[in-house]
């Protein structure tokens, strides 16, 4: 059991190291429509996002039909970003609560309908810290930058392991609760079946007695 648990945590650690923690998306959005994108974020994690509408006529200003409203909310409904009638923007915040965060894009209503092409990049954790912007040319500063990046990566993996462990404990509690409820339901179903069978037996007995069969 211990070896299996150790192997499980090793696999989770490898996945945490290699799994992507940023999303770069390109999608189309029609006039008057809304598209939402979810991201599972740990509490106290930094997250940044930026978005823009592709310009179909490069070098010219975007028409008024090419505007969107953007809203980023937590699973409990708290608002972290809200922009109206924009063609580009960005957001950054530290997640207060763990869970799914939703970024919803709504295109302005227009007739005839137009299609907007939107680029959206969402980074969480280590990748949200733009270390490349603070890296310098000197060898010492480059080494310091690499060490800080590695420390951030290690801390992120450490936090991810604790987060996964907490999620695993929550799932185990849910499974135990579900099994208990299923056991009670099985017992209740058994007594219901016994009761129905008894009622049928009494009904048949009364019926046959009236018919003088027994």
UniProtKB/Swiss-Prot annotation:
Motif COPI vesicle coat-binding per UniProt: ranges: 207-214
GO biological process, one term: protein transport
Lumenal compartment spans: 25-181
Keywords: Coiled coil, Endoplasmic reticulum, ER-Golgi transport, Glycoprotein, Golgi apparatus, Membrane, Methylation, Protein transport, Signal, Transmembrane, Transmembrane helix, Transport
Gene Ontology CC: endoplasmic reticulum; endoplasmic reticulum membrane; Golgi cisterna membrane
Pfam families given in the database record: EMP24_GP25L
Residue ranges occupied by any GOLD domain in the UniProt entry: 34-149
Superkingdom of origin: Eukaryota
PTM sites of type Omega-N-methylated arginine: 167
SMART domains in UniProt: EMP24_GP25L
Membrane topology field: Single-pass type I membrane protein
Subcellular location: Endoplasmic reticulum membrane; Golgi apparatus, cis-Golgi network membrane; Golgi apparatus, Golgi stack membrane
Additional remark text: The lumenal coiled-coil domain is required for the Golgi subcellular location.
Subunit: Probably oligomerizes with other members of the EMP24/GP25L family. Associates with the COPI vesicle coat (coatomer). Associates with the COPII vesicle coat (coatomer).
Protein name as annotated: Transmembrane emp24 domain-containing protein p24delta10
Gene source species: Arabidopsis thaliana
């Amino acid at each position: 059991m211990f070896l299996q648990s150790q192997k499980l945590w090793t696999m989770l650690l490898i996945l945490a190291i290699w799994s992507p923690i940023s999303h770069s998306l390109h999608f189309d959005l029609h006039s008057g429509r809304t598209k939402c994108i979810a991201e599972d974020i740990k509490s106290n994690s930094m997250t940044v996002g930026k978005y823009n509408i592709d310009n179909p006529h490069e070098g010219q200003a975007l028409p008024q039909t090419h505007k969107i409203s953007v809203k980023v909310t937590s699973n409990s409904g708290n608002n972290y970003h809200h922009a109206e009638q924009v063609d580009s923007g960005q957001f950054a915040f530290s997640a207060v609560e763990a869970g799914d965060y939703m970024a919803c894009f709504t295109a302005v209503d227009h007739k005839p309908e137009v299609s907007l092409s939107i680029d959206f990049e969402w980074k969480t954790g280590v990748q949200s810290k733009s270390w490349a912007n603070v890296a310098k040319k000197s060898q010492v500063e480059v080494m310091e930058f690499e060490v800080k990046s590695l420390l951030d990566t290690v801390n992120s993996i450490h936090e991810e392991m604790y987060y996964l462990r907490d999620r695993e404990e929550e799932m185990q509690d849910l499974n135990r609760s579900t099994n208990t409820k299923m056991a009670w339901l099985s017992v209740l179903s058994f007594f219901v079946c016994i009761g129905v069978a008894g009622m049928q037996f009494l009904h048949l007995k009364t019926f046959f007695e009236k018919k003088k069969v027994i």
